[in-house]
Amino acid sequence: MIRTEEMLLNVGPQHPSTHGVFRLVIKIDGEIIKEATPVIGYLHRGTEKIAESLQYTQIIPYTDRMDYLSAMTNNYVICHAVETMMGLEIPERAEYLRVLAMELGRIASHLVWWGTNLLDIGAVSPFLYAFREREMIINLLNELCGARLTFNYMRVGGVKWDAPDGWIEKVKEFVPYMREQLAGYHDLVSGNEIFLNRVKGVGIYSAEEAISYSLSGANLRCTGVNWDLRKDEPYSIYDRFDFDIPVGSVGDAWDRYVCRMQEIEESLKIVEQAVQQFPKEGAVLAKVPKIIKAPKGEAFVRIESPRGEIGCYIASDGKKEPYRLKFRRPSFYNLQILPKLLKGENIANLITILGGVDIVLGEVDG
């Protein structure tokens, strides 16, 4: 008598496609996934609890290590929360430097996603091109703050350092170069028949499902939901810039790809306008006490990171350390839909779907 048995298969925690210590336990029948269970926590460091014993400025380097592919947005959200509680007015030059740093970081983050996602499904050359352009951005950020990955650049009240001489001009020159390369990326990949067969119609979910799972970022917008905090709840100086919010319609891996690729172009628009409007002089840090004490009370702020809505809740009892600190980490929420997406899929689509969700494990585990 012929019989079949379901097999348990571990993907990770050490697996090249997970880009971090992430384990996925899948139950397969032949090549069809019957069940998928994410196992997280391998990179948990207790950031929120540690923060309760740190001064506010000391917390900033810890945020670098959550979403380490987009550290600038993490820096900003903690500073923004404290500034909101203190009612600080940020110098204009500092705001422009913050926006430039965050949008360059957004482009760099999407380049890592583009290159590694394609590498995982079998395309080697895009990975090399993506890291070539990312290296240029990392060099620009290195000139700005002296670090390549964990920047520790922003401060409550502004930024730590002003832009060095010639830096704005280098950023200005980078924009047309990156646009040219982006067109080349589309020629290389976006119309490729093999690639389209791997992503179109794969990993579909509806707008209602995306909202019920609390998805955000490109994982939400790919379903047609036009929601981006830079437009819908503008913070910093984003209301001064003219840019569009890319949205999809089907909610599959292809729509997620298109949304992120178009986001690179929109970030280039913001960078271009920020360079044109950049103040010629001015302070980069507001007058704040050396030891910052947030007033008693609570504050919650949220901003748009490359992976979605990152939020920061602070409860203060008036001391130099927060009484309670809580981050809303978008990768953690985006990951929750993965079991639904994988159920019933061919195992060959697993890596395509996982890469399309674009999680960072430092952010998932916290």
From Swiss-Prot:
Pfam families in alphabetical order: Complex1_49kDa
Keywords: Cell membrane, Membrane, NAD, Quinone, Translocase, Transport
Gene Ontology cellular-component terms listed: plasma membrane
Subcellular location: Cell membrane
GO molecular function: NAD binding; NADH:ubiquinone reductase (non-electrogenic) activity; quinone binding
E.C. numbers: 7.1.1.-
Reactions catalysed: a quinone + NADH + 5 H(+)(in) = a quinol + NAD(+) + 4 H(+)(out)
InterPro entries xref list: NADH_Q_OxRdtase_suD (IPR001135), NDH1_su_D/H (IPR022885), NiFe-Hase_large (IPR029014)
Family: Belongs to the complex I 49 kDa subunit family.
Function: NDH-1 shuttles electrons from NADH, via FMN and iron-sulfur (Fe-S) centers, to quinones in the respiratory chain. The immediate electron acceptor for the enzyme in this species is believed to be a menaquinone. Couples the redox reaction to proton translocation (for every two electrons transferred, four hydrogen ions are translocated across the cytoplasmic membrane), and thus conserves the redox energy in a proton gradient.
Description of how the protein assembles with itself and partners: NDH-1 is composed of 14 different subunits. Subunits NuoB, C, D, E, F, and G constitute the peripheral sector of the complex.
Protein name: NADH-quinone oxidoreductase subunit D
The species this protein was found in: Bacillus anthracis
Gene: nuoD
